[in-house]
Amino acid sequence: MVQPCSAYGCKNRYDKDKPVSFHKFPLTRPSLCKEWEAAVRRKNFKPTKYSSICSEHFTPDCFKRECNNKLLKENAVPTIFLCTEPHDKKEDLEPQEQLPPPPLPPPVSQVDAAIGLLMPPLQTPVNLSVFCDHNYTVEDTMHQRKRIHQLEQQVEKLRKKLKTAQQRCRRQERQLEKLKEVVHFQKEKDNVSERGYVILPNDYFEIVEVPA
């Protein structure tokens, strides 16, 4: 069976006398095979074990030089296609962008003929939606302000508690210093007692007058 090239518009067929080599689709490597299918760009084309692409659709760097440009590299993909299969006109037409609806005319104030007063414009659905959105925004802002006020109060309470704790720590430090002084004084007193000093009364010594 003569082996044709699967590329659209390519008329090459296998001929051992021509320097054109044919390379089958890598069906055993699905990801690489999908790249080949995408490169061919043929609608509803599914390669089979007989489908192949001729060497004219590959760039020179896709071939192994040591094999005389007859074997493809592992990740080679065909990229040279002079002809592509035409698509349907419906597919070629790009979807037109949908234009936004024209803006609604501004509401016109009405005059009540019975009382001669200028009446406010009727609330259209657009106006109602804007009004509702504005209400939601105001409510969210008020809620956020209330929450911020609550957080500020909590911070103030924590600041007061911290100040009280710091004062308590300073008092305890002063008490500790006093206790250290008392202990030091008591140790000094005990050391004096151990040395055996005797405190004599003031009238123990007599004053002797020495004649001149």
Swiss-Prot record:
Motif HCFC1-binding motif (HBM) mapped to chain: 133-136
Return one Gene Ontology term, BP aspect.
Answer: regulation of transcription by RNA polymerase II
Report which superkingdom the organism of origin falls in: Eukaryota
The answer, when asked if Oxidoreductase is one of the entry's keywords, is: no
GO MF annotations in UniProt: DNA-binding transcription factor activity; protein homodimerization activity; RNA polymerase II cis-regulatory region sequence-specific DNA binding; sequence-specific DNA binding; zinc ion binding
Segments forming a coiled coil = 138-189
Q: Which Pfam families match?
A: THAP
Kindly list the ranges of residues that form THAP-type zinc fingers according to the record: 5-57
Extract the PROSITE patterns matched here.
ZF_THAP (PS50950)
Keyword Transmembrane helix in annotation: no
Intracellular or extracellular location(s): Nucleus, Nucleoplasm; Nucleus, PML body
> Which SMART domains did the record assign?
DM3, THAP
Q: Name one GO cellular component term.
A: PML body
| Location (main, coarse) | nucleus
Instruction: Tell me which UniProt keywords the record has, alphabetically.
Output: Cell cycle, Coiled coil, DNA-binding, Metal-binding, Nucleus, Transcription, Transcription regulation, Zinc, Zinc-finger
Protein family according to the UniProt entry: Belongs to the THAP1 family.
Role, per record: DNA-binding transcription regulator that regulates endothelial cell proliferation and G1/S cell-cycle progression. Specifically binds the 5'-[AT]NTNN[GT]GGCA[AGT]-3' core DNA sequence and acts by modulating expression of pRB-E2F cell-cycle target genes, including RRM1. Component of a THAP1/THAP3-HCFC1-OGT complex that is required for the regulation of the transcriptional activity of RRM1. May also have pro-apoptotic activity by potentiating both serum-withdrawal and TNF-induced apoptosis.
User: What is the protein's given name?
Assistant: THAP domain-containing protein 1
| Organism (species) | Macaca fascicularis
What gene name does this entry carry?
THAP1
